[in-house]
Amino acid sequence: MTKLGRRNDGGGKSHRSSTKRQRRTSVSVDDPSPGEEEEKTLVVLTDDSDSEEDDKPLGDVLRTCRKRRVSSPKSVTLPNSNVLECPNCFDPLKKPIFQCNNGHLACFLCCIKLKKRCSFCKLPIGDVRCRAMEKVIKAGLVSCSNAIYGCKQSTTYGNQLQSHEKVCVFAPCSCPIKDCNYIGFYKDLINHFRATHKVSPGDINSFVFDRPVIFGLDLDSSDKMVIFVEEKQGNLFVVQGFIGSHGVYATVSHIAPMVPEVRKFSCSLARLRPYSTLRLGLEVKNIQKLRSQEEQPQEDFLLIPSYMVNGDHMKMEISIGDKNDYTHI
């Protein structure tokens, strides 16, 4: 009878494989859980193939199928980046990140300041690293804060983000017109200026680089400034006058962020009188917002002495060029 059983089965291995298929199929039917039903179904499909997994234990096959399941999402969006800040100093978290036994976090500098005592529960902190959060910080990408002004750069959270924003060419610049709240990319500023403020031709002085322009600076106006627009490239410059105890301090500014990618300029600024001229070569500062009249400049200005200030109107001349054109002899 033993021989007949072997002859009818066609071999012991086939009998064991059949039993294994029946046992696994019954498990997939008995469990009503959707997640596990999907997993058991995968096992059944694997068993019906001719692969070598017929001889593997059920536990090994289940583990193999789990690895074949659909991977997790490639990106995650955080509604608020505050979760990536140190809860003590509120600076961006960066390696190393430490945690106490209750799971409270602290950056390296805060651990030193707190003398390795958690600020929330007073337990020791500073010896156990929070590797999970360090991985999140390392893998996370954050958009530049200037994205609303056109920047498309994304960097890892922490030091790299701060480093990028310090040199981002899309850093916002304010319109030089008083009481205007417009803020935007510096190359868009001139379009806003012309479209919104409807200024008359005399209020904007057009010029070409390295060509002198004669203009008047009125000291009786509230803003005491003159705006210049370069005809070809549209760069926006402002000459401001600040009245001080020794005379008038005249400055020249380029409305743009102070970053390496933005072109740097210098200028020749002169006070013209019938029988005398006061001239100075100046470095033109890039600024994102004009100084108020209360902020007297400390550097890079032409001081026009009181004896050369006659009345409220001064005749002046300016020529603007590249960074070293007017500051090096």
Curated annotation (Swiss-Prot):
Q: Where is the composition biased (Basic and acidic residues)?
A: 1-12
GO biological process annotations for this chain's record? protein ubiquitination; ubiquitin-dependent protein catabolic process; vegetative to reproductive phase transition of meristem
Q: Region SBD: what ranges?
A: 136-325
Mention any Pfam family matching this sequence: Sina_RING
Which residue numbers delimit the SIAH-type Zn fingers? 139-198
Q: Which residues form a coiled coil?
A: none
Keywords carried by this UniProt record? Metal-binding, Transferase, Ubl conjugation pathway, Zinc, Zinc-finger
Q: By what name is this protein known?
A: E3 ubiquitin-protein ligase SINA-like 4
